[in-house]
């Protein structure tokens, strides 16, 4: 009688397992081939007409864009907010900001405006009206300087045309009113604005001096 050693037993077990695996794969292929010939009851094939294809594409796109939008929202949820709590907080203004108009004076208190009327001529909205008379010393000064702020388009041409930096557009942008008449500025109103913002206006002009 032949005695079986351990290596022989292991080899026999490996051959038996390989044979079983081969039979299983053959059965799987056979089952797949048979299943392909089955007729499934109530199986609805997707319609391939243009309307159905378009509807399916639209639904897919809708959900895709919806998920992308939600993802974008969540990505900004924990970031630093870009908005500020206006009017309690205010953002920085450029030195070139064009806001409410003002007429400036020299440090001596003398009006800068020499009544050349260049600002009146250059204004594309025809919002500026100037009247002037000569003084006893021969210099010309304005007797009337009106700006209709409802016409002004804040182009800054008046400020650029002025040879003595008399008319400027100041840093104030909060000058809403309840009546139309309050937006018709006269010379006194403009000079008061200039006196109020002179330090800031002078600093802005100096900051922008190299680019003028």
UniProtKB/Swiss-Prot annotation:
Listed EC numbers: 7.1.1.2
> Where this protein primarily resides, as one coarse class?
mitochondrion
What domain of life is recorded for the organism?
Answer: Eukaryota
Q: What is an annotated GO biological process for this record, any one?
A: mitochondrial respiratory chain complex I assembly
UniProt-annotated location(s): Mitochondrion inner membrane
Q: Would the keyword NAD be found if you checked this record's keyword annotation?
A: yes
Please provide, alphabetically and separated by semicolons, the GO molecular function terms listed in this UniProt record. Answer: 4 iron, 4 sulfur cluster binding; metal ion binding; NADH dehydrogenase (ubiquinone) activity
Co-factor remark: Binds 2 [4Fe-4S] clusters per subunit.
- Organelle transit peptide: 1-36
Stated membrane topology is: Peripheral membrane protein
Entry's Gene Ontology cellular component terms: mitochondrial inner membrane; respiratory chain complex I
The catalytic activity, as recorded, is: a ubiquinone + NADH + 5 H(+)(in) = a ubiquinol + NAD(+) + 4 H(+)(out)
| EC category | translocase
Any idea which UniProt keywords this protein has?
A: 4Fe-4S, Electron transport, Iron, Iron-sulfur, Membrane, Metal-binding, Mitochondrion, Mitochondrion inner membrane, NAD, Oxidoreductase, Repeat, Respiratory chain, Transit peptide, Translocase, Transport, Ubiquinone
Cofactor(s) needed for function: [4Fe-4S] cluster
Q: Name the positions where [4Fe-4S] cluster 2 binds.
A: 123, 152, 155, 158
Q: Give the transmembrane region(s).
A: none
* Biological role stated in the UniProt entry: Core subunit of the mitochondrial membrane respiratory chain NADH dehydrogenase (Complex I) which catalyzes electron transfer from NADH through the respiratory chain, using ubiquinone as an electron acceptor. Essential for the catalytic activity and assembly of complex I.
Q: Which PANTHER family match?
A: NADH DEHYDROGENASE [UBIQUINONE] IRON-SULFUR PROTEIN 8, MITOCHONDRIAL, NADH DEHYDROGENASE UBIQUINONE IRON-SULFUR PROTEIN 8, MITOCHONDRIAL
Report the family membership.
Belongs to the complex I 23 kDa subunit family.
Subunit info here reads:
Core subunit of respiratory chain NADH dehydrogenase (Complex I) which is composed of 45 different subunits. This is a component of the iron-sulfur (IP) fragment of the enzyme. Interacts with RAB5IF.
**NCBIfam families this protein is in?**
NuoI, PRK05888.1-4, PRK05888.1-5
This chain's protein is named NADH dehydrogenase [ubiquinone] iron-sulfur protein 8, mitochondrial
């Amino acid at each position: 009688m032949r005695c079986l050693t351990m290596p022989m037993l292991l080899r026999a077990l490996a051959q038996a397992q390989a044979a079983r695996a081969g039979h299983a794969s053959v059965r799987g292929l056979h089952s797949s081939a048979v299943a392909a010939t089955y007729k499934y009851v109530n199986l609805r094939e997707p319609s391939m007409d243009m309307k159905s294809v378009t509807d399916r594409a639209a639904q897919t796109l809708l959900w895709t864009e919806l998920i992308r939008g939600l993802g974008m929202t969540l990505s900004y949820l924990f970031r630093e907010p870009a908005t500020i709590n206006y009017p309690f907080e205010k953002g920085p203004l450029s030195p070139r900001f064009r806001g409410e108009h003002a007429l400036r004076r020299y440090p001596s208190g003398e009006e800068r405006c020499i009544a050349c009327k260049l600002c009146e001529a250059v204004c594309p909205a025809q919002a500026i009206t100037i009247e002037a008379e000569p003084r006893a010393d021969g210099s010309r000064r304005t007797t009337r300087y009106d700006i209709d702020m409802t016409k002004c388009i804040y182009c800054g041409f008046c400020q650029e045309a002025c040879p003595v930096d008399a008319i400027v557009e100041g840093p104030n942008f909060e000058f809403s009113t309840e009546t139309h008449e309050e937006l018709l500025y006269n010379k006194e109103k403009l000079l008061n604005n200039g006196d109020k913002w002179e330090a800031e206006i002078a600093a802005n002009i100096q900051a922008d001096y190299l680019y003028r």
